[in-house]
């Protein structure tokens, strides 16, 4: 009985993945160095990348969010839910 209970606890922990935090890119370039990553805060389950053109060229903003941010017209956005997907 104790073995069964212990097995259930282990399986539950593995399925819930307790303590997991999403990791998103935070750089503002087309490609990001591997050290430009951030562990998102609790409740932030989305990585996003917004990008738009200016007179100075392409602008990019990346980060973590609880929901996919709303953007102004002319700004493109990509939202995703896996590590380093932005």
Curated annotation (Swiss-Prot):
Keywords assigned by UniProt, alphabetized: Acetylcholine receptor inhibiting toxin, Disulfide bond, Ion channel impairing toxin, Neurotoxin, Postsynaptic neurotoxin, Secreted, Signal, Toxin
Function as written in the Swiss-Prot or TrEMBL entry: Binds and inhibits muscular and neuronal nicotinic acetylcholine receptors (nAChR).
Tissue-wise expression: Expressed by the venom gland.
Listed GO CC annotations: extracellular region
Family: Belongs to the three-finger toxin family. Ancestral subfamily. Orphan group IV sub-subfamily.
Gene Ontology molecular function terms on file: acetylcholine receptor inhibitor activity; ion channel regulator activity; toxin activity
Signal peptide per UniProt: 1-21
Protein's UniProt name: Alpha-neurotoxin homolog 8
Major localisation: secreted
Compartment(s) of residence: Secreted
Cysteine pairings via disulfide bonds: 24-47, 27-32, 40-64, 68-79, 80-85
């Amino acid at each position: 009985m104790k073995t069964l209970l212990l097995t259930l606890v282990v399986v539950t922990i593995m399925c819930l993945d307790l303590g997991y935090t999403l990791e998103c890119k935070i750089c503002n370039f087309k490609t990001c160095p591997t050290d430009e990553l951030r562990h998102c805060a609790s409740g932030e389950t989305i990585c996003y990348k917004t990008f738009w053109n200016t007179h100075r060229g392409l602008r990019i903003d990346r980060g973590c969010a609880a929901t996919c941010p709303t953007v102004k017209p002319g700004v493109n956005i990509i939202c995703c839910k896996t590590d380093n997907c932005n």
